[in-house]
Design a protein with these regions (language model features):
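Extreme N-terminal starter segment of soluble prokaryotic enzymes
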Residues: 1-4
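Short internal beta-strands
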Residues: 97-102
Length: 102
Protein backbone atom coordinates (compact mmCIF):
# COMPACT_ATOMS: atom_id res chain seq x y z
CA UNK A 1 0.00 0.00 0.00
CA UNK A 2 1.25 3.47 -0.90
CA UNK A 3 0.23 6.30 1.46
CA UNK A 4 1.14 9.96 1.05
CA UNK A 5 0.23 12.98 3.16
CA UNK A 6 -0.75 15.95 1.00
CA UNK A 7 -1.61 18.36 3.81
CA UNK A 8 -1.14 18.15 7.58
CA UNK A 9 -2.30 21.48 9.01
CA UNK A 10 -5.35 22.54 10.98
CA UNK A 11 -8.51 24.10 9.56
CA UNK A 12 -6.92 27.36 8.43
CA UNK A 13 -3.54 26.03 7.33
CA UNK A 14 -0.21 27.08 8.80
CA UNK A 15 0.75 29.83 9.23
CA UNK A 16 -2.72 31.09 10.04
CA UNK A 17 -4.17 33.40 7.39
CA UNK A 18 -4.82 36.46 9.57
CA UNK A 19 -2.25 35.91 12.33
CA UNK A 20 0.87 37.89 13.11
CA UNK A 21 2.00 36.02 16.20
CA UNK A 22 5.73 35.24 16.41
CA UNK A 23 5.20 31.61 15.34
CA UNK A 24 3.17 32.44 12.24
CA UNK A 25 5.56 35.24 11.26
CA UNK A 26 8.52 32.87 11.61
CA UNK A 27 6.79 30.22 9.49
CA UNK A 28 6.04 32.83 6.79
CA UNK A 29 9.66 33.97 6.82
CA UNK A 30 11.18 30.47 6.71
CA UNK A 31 8.72 29.06 4.14
CA UNK A 32 9.31 25.54 2.80
CA UNK A 33 8.33 22.79 5.23
CA UNK A 34 7.08 25.45 7.67
CA UNK A 35 4.10 26.14 5.37
CA UNK A 36 1.35 23.56 5.77
CA UNK A 37 -1.93 23.06 3.95
CA UNK A 38 -5.19 21.56 5.19
CA UNK A 39 -5.30 17.85 6.01
CA UNK A 40 -5.50 15.40 3.12
CA UNK A 41 -3.85 12.15 2.08
CA UNK A 42 -3.89 9.80 -0.89
CA UNK A 43 -3.73 6.00 -0.91
CA UNK A 44 -2.41 4.06 -3.93
CA UNK A 45 -2.97 7.08 -6.23
CA UNK A 46 -6.70 6.31 -6.45
CA UNK A 47 -8.27 7.10 -3.05
CA UNK A 48 -8.27 10.50 -1.40
CA UNK A 49 -8.77 10.87 2.31
CA UNK A 50 -10.71 14.10 2.75
CA UNK A 51 -11.36 16.78 0.13
CA UNK A 52 -10.33 20.19 1.55
CA UNK A 53 -10.21 23.52 -0.26
CA UNK A 54 -6.48 22.93 -0.80
CA UNK A 55 -7.02 19.88 -3.05
CA UNK A 56 -6.25 21.83 -6.24
CA UNK A 57 -3.03 23.19 -4.69
CA UNK A 58 -2.06 19.68 -3.59
CA UNK A 59 -2.39 18.47 -7.16
CA UNK A 60 -0.26 21.33 -8.49
CA UNK A 61 2.48 21.07 -5.86
CA UNK A 62 2.83 17.28 -6.05
CA UNK A 63 2.35 16.95 -9.81
CA UNK A 64 0.08 13.97 -9.15
CA UNK A 65 -2.49 12.82 -11.70
CA UNK A 66 -5.79 13.16 -9.87
CA UNK A 67 -7.69 11.74 -12.85
CA UNK A 68 -6.74 8.34 -11.37
CA UNK A 69 -8.74 9.06 -8.21
CA UNK A 70 -11.78 6.78 -7.95
CA UNK A 71 -12.72 7.07 -4.29
CA UNK A 72 -12.79 9.73 -1.59
CA UNK A 73 -13.12 8.90 2.09
CA UNK A 74 -14.43 11.95 3.96
CA UNK A 75 -13.53 11.63 7.63
CA UNK A 76 -16.12 14.21 8.68
CA UNK A 77 -18.12 17.04 7.14
CA UNK A 78 -16.33 20.09 8.59
CA UNK A 79 -15.43 22.60 5.88
CA UNK A 80 -11.68 22.04 6.37
CA UNK A 81 -12.08 18.38 5.39
CA UNK A 82 -14.83 18.53 2.77
CA UNK A 83 -15.35 21.28 0.18
CA UNK A 84 -17.45 19.54 -2.49
CA UNK A 85 -17.65 22.38 -5.03
CA UNK A 86 -14.61 21.10 -6.97
CA UNK A 87 -16.30 17.70 -7.33
CA UNK A 88 -18.76 19.34 -9.74
CA UNK A 89 -15.95 19.43 -12.32
CA UNK A 90 -15.63 15.64 -12.10
CA UNK A 91 -19.29 15.05 -12.94
CA UNK A 92 -20.45 13.73 -16.29
CA UNK A 93 -21.53 16.57 -18.54
CA UNK A 94 -19.21 19.17 -17.02
CA UNK A 95 -16.55 20.07 -19.56
CA UNK A 96 -14.30 22.73 -18.11
CA UNK A 97 -11.36 21.37 -20.14
CA UNK A 98 -10.60 19.15 -23.11
CA UNK A 99 -11.87 15.62 -22.59
CA UNK A 100 -10.15 12.58 -24.03
CA UNK A 101 -12.15 10.07 -26.02
CA UNK A 102 -12.77 6.69 -24.38
Amino acid sequence: MKFRYLGTAASEGWPALFCNCEYCLKAKKLGGKNLRTRSQAIVNDDMLIDFPGDTFAHMLVTGMDFSKVRWCLVTHSHCDHFVPIDLCFHAEGCYAHNMTEK
